[in-house]
């Protein structure tokens, strides 16, 4: 006796003998028949698709003999084979010890009354009805319509009433005795809400819903203090352990590799042979190795083509004052170049102190800027000397250290330059006189 192989929905119609109740220690209970959900559709090789005495006759013909039944379950929507031994010696009434009624599967699934809110101290609460998980599926009388249940409650006012109740949480049926009482102190005779219709039917479940996996011992068989079979191994909690930064593989999932900003995202994830791949430790648990993040690429600077190209000139490094730029030997600052630069260049030279400490010398061919730093002051002796005329000396700022040195240098060289100009003028005068005499 027991359960057999499950199959799809039965052929030959959607009717059968519906089990309303199964008594304790009866042949039906020993065979594993489930009240309300099971329909007997075949006995032996006879399909029970009509309401007649075929089931009763075949049970009497096989008293104390095993007989095979095909049973359709509305909860799993499957057909299974059951072996039962009809008997008169089990101590109860009937050969099976179960009450049956011929009806269709669809109609039986609709005859469900869902227990909703249960008020405290109400007749429903005293009877042990559980809100939202209990379903009334039958009683001592046949219930065929939605109003039949409410009529049954009214007819049993102040009298005990037996109800067959299914609980979706425990996946089992039980018998509940309730005594309707309209004077209990609240609304209704039961003190609970009742739902009926499509939204209040018992949800279907897969065939393996209430079956435990093989090899799992019952809770009582586990030793004291032992973790359950599906418990996680001991280790750091997700809050205490750092997140994995590698593209490691474990069973059937892949963890993405974190990329630094600007790095290529087309790099393949590390394979099983890479250092970051998870490898099992001696205990059989995966071990993850962390890979540090790659630094971001250097920042690229783009020069504007409109600026001066100083690629051929070594500029001063503030961190190293011993290196000083060497100007090309062909570059010379003359009095003529400075005098022809105009007042704008002189103004920019005099206002260099106000622009962050830059001193700028402007000429007709180039323009060089020097930063105001200790290294620049230490190499002031190597700067080219400028000679300015008397009319331009007043424009220099005495507060600028470089301008003061230039003014002193100009004061020392001014007599020599003046004598040179006078000598040149006399020479030109003699040449012109010689030319005039020759012409005459």
From Swiss-Prot:
Secretion signal, residue range per the UniProt entry: none
InterPro entries xrefs: GRASP55_65, GRASP_PDZ, PDZ_sf
Coiled-coil ranges from the UniProt annotation: none
Bias (Polar residues): 337-351
Name of the protein this chain belongs to: Golgi reassembly-stacking protein 1
Pro residues composition-biased segments: 214-239
Subunit structure: Homodimer. Forms higher-order oligomers under interphase but not mitotic conditions. Dimers of the protein on one membrane might be able to interact with dimers on another and so stack cisternae. Interacts with the C-terminus of GOLGA2/GM130 under both mitotic and non-mitotic conditions. The interaction is critical for the correct targeting of both proteins to the cis-Golgi. Interacts with TMED2 and TMED3.
Top-level taxon: Eukaryota
Source organism of this protein record: Homo sapiens (Human)
Family: Belongs to the GORASP family.
Lipidation (N-myristoyl glycine): 2
């Amino acid at each position: 006796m027991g359960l057999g192989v499950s199959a799809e929905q039965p052929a030959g119609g959607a009717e059968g003998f519906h089990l309303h109740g199964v008594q304790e220690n009866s042949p039906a209970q020993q065979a594993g028949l489930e009240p309300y959900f099971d329909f007997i559709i075949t006995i032996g090789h006879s399909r029970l698709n009509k309401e007649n005495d075929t089931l009763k006759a075949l049970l009497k013909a096989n008293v104390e003999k095993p007989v095979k039944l095909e049973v359709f379950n509305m909860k799993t929507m499957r057909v299974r084979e059951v072996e039962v031994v009809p008997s008169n010696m089990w101590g109860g009434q009937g050969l099976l010890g179960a009450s049956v009624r011929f009806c269709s599967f669809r109609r039986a699934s609709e005859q469900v009354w869902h227990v909703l809110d249960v008020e405290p101290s109400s007749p429903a609460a005293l009877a042990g009805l559980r809100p939202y998980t209990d379903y009334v599926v039958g009683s001592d009388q046949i219930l065929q319509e939605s109003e039949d249940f409410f009529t049954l409650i009214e007819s049993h006012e102040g009298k005990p009433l037996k109800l067959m109740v299914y609980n979706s949480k425990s996946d089992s049926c039980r018998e509940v005795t309730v005594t309707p009482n309209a004077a209990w102190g609240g609304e209704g005779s039961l003190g609970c809400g009742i739902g009926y219709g499509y939204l209040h039917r018992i949800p279907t479940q897969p065939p393996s819903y209430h079956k435990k996996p093989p090899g799992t011992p019952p809770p009582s068989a586990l030793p004291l203090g032992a973790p359950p079979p599906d418990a996680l191994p001991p280790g750091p909690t997700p809050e205490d352990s750092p997140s994995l930064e590698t593209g490691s593989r474990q069973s059937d999932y892949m963890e993405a590799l974190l990329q630094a900003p600007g790095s290529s995202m087309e790099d393949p994830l590390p394979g099983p042979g890479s250092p970051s791949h998870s490898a099992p430790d001696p205990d059989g648990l995966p071990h993850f190795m962390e890979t540090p993040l790659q630094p971001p690429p250097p920042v690229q600077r783009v020069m504007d083509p409109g600026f001066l190209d100083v690629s051929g000139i070594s500029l001063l490094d503030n961190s190293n004052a011993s290196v000083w730029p060497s100007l090309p030997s062909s570059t010379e600052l003359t009095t003529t170049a400075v005098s022809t630069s105009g007042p704008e260049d002189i103004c920019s030279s005099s206002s260099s102190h106000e622009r962050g400490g830059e001193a700028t010398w402007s000429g007709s061919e180039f323009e060089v800027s020097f930063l105001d730093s200790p290294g620049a002051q230490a190499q002031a002796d190597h700067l080219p000397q400028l000679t300015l005329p008397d009319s331009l000396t007043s424009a220099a700022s005495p507060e600028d250290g470089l301008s003061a040195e230039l003014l002193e240098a100009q004061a020392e060289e001014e007599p020599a330059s003046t004598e040179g100009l006078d000598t040149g003028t006399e020479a030109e005068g003699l040449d012109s006189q010689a030319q005039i005499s020759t012409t005459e």
